[in-house]
Every structure is written in C-alpha cells, then in structure tokens.
Design a protein with these regions (language model features):
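Short structural boundary motif marking the start of a folded domain
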Residues: 1-4
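Short amphipathic alpha-helix segments
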Residues: 7-27
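Helix N-cap motif at beta-to-alpha junctions
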Residues: 9-14, 43-49
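Generic structural signal for short, flexible, solvent-exposed coil/loop and linker residues
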Residues: 19, 29-31, 40
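Short amphipathic alpha-helices in soluble, non-transmembrane regions
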Residues: 19-23, 50-59
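Intrinsically disordered, low-complexity segments enriched in polar/charged small residues
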Residues: 24, 34-36
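Conserved short beta-strand edge segments in small beta-sheet-based binding/regulatory domains
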Residues: 28-32, 56-59
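A generic structural motif
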Residues: 36-44
Length: 59
C-alpha cells in the first residue's frame, strides 16, 4: 500500500484513480483531508517503483 497527500489543484482524485487503476490493475481510494488536499491510497500494486515515479509527478 502506498499513500500520499495531493492538492486538488494538481489533479482531480477521480482522474488520478482512473489513470492508476488502468495502468497498474490495482485498487485506489481517496479521502478529503481539508478543502485543498486529499489523501490518495493505492492497494495491490506490484510495481511500486513505477507507481512512486508516477505519483511523484503529482506530489
């Protein structure tokens, strides 16, 4: 499992979830932390190095 905090200004959580679920065939979940930030979690990803590279674009 990998969890990061991302700003709503950077990317919509629904768009990011769709992109990651299609690319890595895994499950995602997100929840609002405050009005500007959400917590995004990824479960069941086998290629964590590539996932971290992708998430680094948004953090």
């Amino acid at each position: 499992m990998k969890t990061v905090l991302i700003s709503y200004e950077t990317v919509s959580p629904a768009v990011l979830a769709h992109k990651i679920e299609r690319a890595f065939a895994c499950m995602t979940k997100y929840r609002e932390v405050d009005e500007d930030t959400y917590e995004f979690s990824v479960f069941g990803c086998t290629d964590l190095a590539m996932l971290e590279d992708l998430l680094a674009e948004y953090v």
